[in-house]
Structure formats: structure tokens, C-alpha cells
Regions:
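Short linear loop/turn motifs
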Residues: 24-28, 87-92, 98-103, 194-213, ...
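Active-site-proximal structural scaffolding
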Residues: 2-3, 19, 37-41, 48, ...
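Sequence context surrounding c-type heme c attachment/ligation sites in exported
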Residues: 186, 197-272
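Surface-exposed patches in mature extracellular/periplasmic domains of secreted proteins
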Residues: 18-22, 40-43, 115-119, 166-173, ...
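A conserved hydrophobic secondary-structure block that centers on an alpha-helix together
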Residues: 2-44, 52
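Glycine-rich, acidic and aromatic/proline-enriched surface loops and short helix-turn segments
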Residues: 8, 12, 16-19, 46-54, ...
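Long, ordered, helix-rich scaffold segments
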Residues: 1, 24, 41, 55-69, ...
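Gly/Pro-rich turn-and-neighbor structural signature
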Residues: 161-184, 188-192
Length: 272
């Protein structure tokens, strides 16, 4: 059983069956002397995890197993499952249609949703977002529970566009009028309440809001603790949406909306 485990571990690490040479080097030869079996297993595990064939998924021949590896890493951030390995062993991944069928199966797995959500979080700059601090005097009803609800609302918004909206594409992320609200958020924004606390239902906000760029969580994240920040939001849009780089500012400037005339537009304030 120890030898069988060692072989299976190396095959899982390499995401394909071992060749005869690999079988000898990574498994059989490690049990050739009289050292304890546990030491042999440790040695095999370390050798496998240090091998370029584990560290570099594209290393090796392009075949069904490499297709299985690309699917698993691309959709799950993981290794191929048993179904993928069986399909690769049977040579059922060598055409686009066969690979597409496996991809559709994998998209129904919760791991695909988790992978895509993480991708969105990195794109939006919220993967490692710290707590959003707000002025308690200016926003007395803002607390950590409300912040958690805002983040949940954003996640549900993304899920609804990607997984539940037929024919949706990237544009829908930017122009959808749908904003998931629970009772607490509805009360905070003065919108129509949903029936049960904690249940996020659909709501259509005012006509000035649409899509990700006006979602309350992102607006709260890319702003100061007591005021708006068109600079932070502009940098976010430029870098994360338009994909353009920005030079460092010539000097540190703090934008304070109340220092400008109320008759000025936001564009005029930022330009000045």
C-alpha cells in the first residue's frame, strides 16, 4: 500500500501517469534499501513537489493530459479530477468538442464559481481590501455589518450577471440596473424593502446608478472616510477598467470637495 500510495502521489503531482523511468526514480528505487517506509514516502513526496513537472504545468508533451491540466488549472485552480484523468487516459480530450464538454461539466462545479469570483475580486482591487473606515458622525448608520452586506451584495451582483443572466457579456457588468439589497441595505438607502432580513432580493435603484462602477461597496472603498474621492475612483477606472498605466503624481494632493465653489462641476474641481 505504501508503494501504491507513493506512485499515486507522484502521478497526481505530475497530473499524468509515470513513465517507466519516472516510476523507477520517483517510487521503486526509494524502497530499495532498508530504511523505514515512512522515510521513503517523505523522500518521494519532496522529490515530486520539487520536480519541474509539478512546478511547471506546461512542461512535457502536448497531449490529452496537458489539456486536462489546462482545464483544471484554468477553471478550478486545482489538479485534474478523476473524470478528467479518465477522459485523458481514453484519449477523449483531443478535439475541441470533447474538451468543451468537459469544460461545461466543470463550470457546474462550485470551484469554478469560486475561481471566477476571486478573479473578479483581484480585478476590482478588493481581494485583500482592508476594512472601510467611515466617519461615524457623518455616517452614524455605517458599521461592519452594513459593510459586510455591501460586499455580499456585490458578490451576488456578479453571480447574477455571470451565472443567471442569459446572453450577458462584459457590458452587462457596467450597465445593469440590478442591485441586490437585503432589509438593512434597503433601509440605509431608502429603497423598497425586501421581505426577510438577511435575504438579498432584486432592487432597481435610481436612474443615476448602473453596474459595477456605481455599486455602493466600490464607491465606499474608493473614497475617503468622510467624503468622495474622484481621484481614487478615476485611478481605479483607468487602471482596472481601461487597462492604462498612470505616471506618479508630481506632488501629493488631497482632494477636498468642500474647498471648492458649490457651483463648480466635479470635472472642473478635479481639473483645478
Amino acid at each position: 500500500k505504501t508503494r501504491e500510495f507513493s506512485q499515486q502521489f507522484a502521478e497526481r503531482a505530475f497530473r499524468r501517469p509515470l513513465t517507466a523511468e519516472q516510476q523507477l526514480f520517483f517510487a521503486d528505487s526509494r524502497f530499495a534499501d532498508s530504511k523505514p517506509a515512512s522515510d521513503s514516502v517523505k523522500e518521494i513526496v519532496l522529490l515530486s513537489l520539487k520536480s519541474p513537472r509539478f512546478l511547471y504545468p506546461d512542461l512535457g508533451q502536448a497531449d490529452d493530459y496537458s489539456v486536462a491540466t489546462r482545464l483544471a488549472i484554468g477553471l478550478w485552480d486545482s489538479m485534474p479530477d478523476d473524470e478528467l484523468l479518465r477522459a485523458a487516459a481514453a484519449g477523449r480530450l483531443n478535439t475541441p468538442d470533447e474538451a468543451r464538454q468537459q469544460a461545461l461539466r466543470m463550470l457546474r462545479d462550485p470551484r469554478s464559481r469560486a475561481k471566477l469570483r476571486n478573479t473578479f475580486h483581484h480585478w476590482l482591487g478588493i481581494a485583500h481590501a482592508e476594512e472601510i473606515a467611515k466617519d461615524t458622525e457623518q455616517y452614524p448608520n455605517y458599521d461592519k455589518s452594513l459593510e459586510a452586506d455591501l460586499r455580499t451584495s456585490l458578490n451576488i451582483f456578479l453571480d447574477n450577471i455571470v451565472w443567471r443572466t442569459a446572453g450577458a457579456d462584459f457590458r452587462k457588468l457596467l450597465n445593469s440596473r440590478h442591485l441586490p439589497l437585503n432589509e438593512r441595505l434597503a433601509g440605509f438607502y431608502g429603497a423598497q424593502r425586501v421581505k426577510h432580513l438577511g435575504e438579498f432580493g432584486p432592487s432597481f435603484f435610481d436612474h443615476e446608478r448602473a453596474g459595477l462602477l456605481t455599486h455602493p461597496y466600490l464607491l465606499a472603498l474608493y473614497s475617503y472616510h468622510n467624503s468622495t474621492s474622484p481621484i481614487h475612483r478615476g485611478v481605479f477606472v483607468t487602471r482596472h477598467v481601461l487597462g492604462r498605466s498612470l505616471k506618479p503624481p508630481p506632488a501629493a494632493v488631497v482632494f477636498k470637495d468642500d474647498t471648492f465653489s458649490p457651483d463648480m462641476t466635479m470635472r472642473e474641481k478635479v481639473t483645478q
